[in-house]
A protein has these predicted regions:
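Flexible, acidic/Gly-rich N-terminal and inter-domain linker regions that tether
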Residues: 14, 24-120, 425, 433, ...
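Long, highly charged, low-complexity intrinsically disordered interaction regions
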Residues: 322-392, 428-452, 456-457, 471
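Single conserved hydrophobic/aromatic residue that forms the stacking wall/gate
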Residues: 1-16
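Core AdoMet radical
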Residues: 131-146, 153-179, 185-206, 213-264, ...
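Flexible glycine/acidic-rich beta-alpha junction loops that bind and position SAM and/or redox cofactors
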Residues: 173, 226-235, 260-286, 305-330, ...
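Catalytic cores of alpha/beta
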Residues: 205-214, 285-298
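Canonical Radical SAM [4Fe-4S] cluster-binding loop centered on the CxxxCxxC motif
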Residues: 24, 115-144
Length: 476
């Protein structure tokens, strides 16, 4: 039966009943009585399959709506947790597994089912597509529907984990309890051992957040708007207290779990991949300084792993409280990520990147180059003598390159070509370093000027093709 289509199975059962009716005319034919029970089983199977097909179509219709509603949440990288396969469980994550595509810390592209439990919401946040006053298709998954959908997608190798968020229905605790039930059923009923990222609902109770951390690899609460006065302007029903309280619960849970596991080897882990958050860029008047100072404060907490920056998308153009943007500020978003990288991996302090006299990042050049051009007195740096911290501040030198420089110069002095082989971007670095065997034409930032170096490193404008020029296409 499994090898044929539903239509073929229906025809098969119809023909079988015709045969059975003919045989039943003979009351002495006892074999027909046993066939009758076989046919009953076939009918039950077909009806069950028919109901299952209807349910699947219904679930897929909900999935189309709720996946579309979830696409504006960017905080779905699943880096930072390891779950190895165990007997009796299904699935695993390897080295931080982050149907959306995300990237793990080692650069691998991974797949997550990124979906909302419901896009109904009691709040009317101006920046949100799912706000209460918007007229859009709405849907809600039951807990069992979402759990079964996740397992079906996982078995078919569509996904490697789940990223689950939700609109707020009734109250934060009611919504959070349903999110927890999804994760709990996946772990305990289906023995799912893949990656799970849950959004913690602002205002949810400590007990529910603590329970969520026992089943999820990562928890996140979105700050959204850095300044509370602007948050109140766009989302009057929210405040920062309701956001930072769950963050505190998550932090306490992670630290307590870490302490318990030092004493008891098999103590349960709590959100082993820590927590993350998201900030909307461009919806309000905050400067890059406001955003980065908030990020720096959040990174000061031991369990905050990532702050994500989401360029504001004009989804509610009718609301006059919002800026009229033709497209998201993607360049600004990219510069914030680069500055965030400097805070996390390059040992920069936030007031070195932005301050009162320089509140916004330069959109034409990256933040590291911008800092170097504002501090020419720090350069040139002797590659063969500078310490690791100073090497990290040289434009064109990354974390990996700096480590290789420190390791390689123990054996011999490094020159221009050795640095190029190591991976240093000499197009940038040449203006900020001295080393062995420099080409004669190379000049440092002090010999030229910061303005001259900036003009040399700015990308050249693309030449426009004259519309009157004849273009010949010779094919391949």
């Amino acid at each position: 039966l499994h090898s044929t289509s539903r239509r073929q199975r229906q025809m098969c059962i119809r023909d079988s009943f015709l045969s059975f009716s003919f045989c039943n005319l003979c009351t002495e034919n006892r074999a027909c009585e046993s066939l009758f029970f076989v046919f009953l089983i076939l009918i039950v199977y077909l009806r069950k399959e028919s109901r299952s097909g209807m349910m699947n179509e219904n679930v897929l219709a909900k999935l189309k709506i709720l996946a579309e509603s979830a696409k504006y949440d960017v905080s779905c990288s699943s880096s930072g947790t390891v779950r190895s396969n165990k007997p009796g469980t299904l699935g695993n994550t390897v080295g931080g597994w982050g149907i959306c595509h995300s990237f793990a810390e080692d650069g691998r592209c991974i797949s997550l089912l990124k979906v909302m439990l419901t896009n109904y919401c009691i709040y009317d946040c101006a920046y949100c597509v799912n706000r209460r006053s918007n007229d859009l298709p709405r849907a809600t998954f039951s807990v069992s529907e979402l759990v079964e959908l996740t397992m079906e997608f996982y078995r078919r190798n569509y996904i490697e984990g789940l990223f689950l968020s939700s609109g707020v229905v009734r109250n934060p605790d009611y919504t959070m309890e349903r999110l927890v039930r999804v994760a709990k059923d996946l772990r305990q009923v289906y023995r799912f051992n893949g990656y799970i990222h849950l959004k913690s609902i602002p205002g949810a109770s400590r007990e529910l957040v603590n329970e969520a951390g026992l089943y999820a690899d990562r928890l996140s609460v979105n700050v959204e708007i850095p300044k509370e006065e602007n948050l109140k302007l766009l989302a009057p029903e929210k405040d920062h207290k309701s956001v930072f309280a769950p963050m505190k619960y998550i932090q306490q849970g992670v630290l307590e779990s870490k302490e318990e596991r030092q004493k008891f080897r098999h103590a349960p882990r709590f959100a082993p991949a820590g927590q993350s958050t998201q900030v909307i860029v461009g919806a309000t008047s905050e400067s890059d300084k406001d955003i980065l100072f908030l990020s720096s404060a959040l990174y000061g907490r031991p369990t905050m792993k990532r702050v994500y920056y989401s360029g504001y998308v004009s989804v509610n153009t009718y609301d006059k409280r919002l800026p009229a943007l033709k497209q998201p500020p993607l360049v600004r978003e990219n510069r914030l990520y680069q500055a965030d990288w400097l805070l996390r991996f390059y040992q920069f302090k936030v007031d070195e990147i932005v301050d009162d006299s320089y509140p916004d990042l330069d959109l034409e050049i990256d933040p590291k180059l911008s800092w170097a051009l504002r501090h020419p007195e720090q350069f040139p740096v002797d590659i063969n003598k500078a310490d690791y911290e100073m090497l990290l501040r040289v434009p064109g030198v990354g974390v990996k390159s700096a480590k290789l420089i420190v390791a390689s110069r123990r054996f011999s002095r490094l020159g221009f070509y050795e640095l190029k082989k190591i991976g240093v971007v000499m197009k940038k670095a040449q203006y900020f370093i001295t080393c062995k065997e420099l080409p004669l034409q190379m000049q440092t930032v002090n010999e030229l000027s910061p303005q001259r170096v900036r003009s040399l490193l700015l990308p050249k404008p693309k030449k426009k093709v004259d519309e009157r020029q004849l273009l010949l296409d010779f094919g391949e």
